[in-house]
């Protein structure tokens, strides 16, 4: 009888229309801001059928833009992977003067406009910059070439791995690392067998975010590339060029390809985030059982 009374009381609760209204508004706004534009990109790309899409994808300039985008990511991501691990290890395992300043400096790529970052690199490595004369004497071209595009991409993507690793490494502490050293493990053995398994999901999550930013970077890359057709056009820059040439199908084809890359990256990010959250829950449960 008590259960029936409790059920009736539960059923008698008024519906929270305000909550559902806010949920509906949030879903609607998200759909129009995020989902509808992505769908529109694919609709426009295939508006004249499959053949124009295939023809645009087979265009030499398009293929070069795809290759250049992938190459930049393949260089920038590993560099930031190593840099992120070393810097995260430094700020989480050692106390030193300027540690907080170093963590603050890592946020500069988030705070500075990518266009400003590209301009700084252009002025520094350009012909009239501090290193420009030396580079010209040795026939080394950084600006208006792919090395400059790689440099600015490394700059704008450098915080992601570090920012993912630091909280995880701080929460885990250094007890396991110290125990491994006491048991006779070398530095590399300690990292490979103790540290890396504990940070692997956060590390992969940071790599996915770095890759997403690397393949989609436009502002900084556009400043230092010179936008030379068939030479220094990454996929985002190729989209702009095709749009300026009134090649609507071509620009939407490139945009659809870039969007597809972003969707795959987002899917990987979500999977890694899910794994990371589950790992943290299991660790908390194990710690609770121990106590």
Swiss-Prot record:
Residues 44-69, 126-141, 222-247 are periplasmic. Pfam families: BPD_transp_1. It comes from the Bacteria. It is found in: Cell inner membrane. GO terms for molecular function: ABC-type sulfate transporter activity. One of its GO terms (cellular component) is plasma membrane. The chain crosses the membrane at residues 23-43, 70-90, 105-125, 142-162, 201-221, 248-268. The keyword Nucleotidyltransferase does not apply. This is Sulfate transport system permease protein CysW. It comes from Escherichia coli (strain K12).
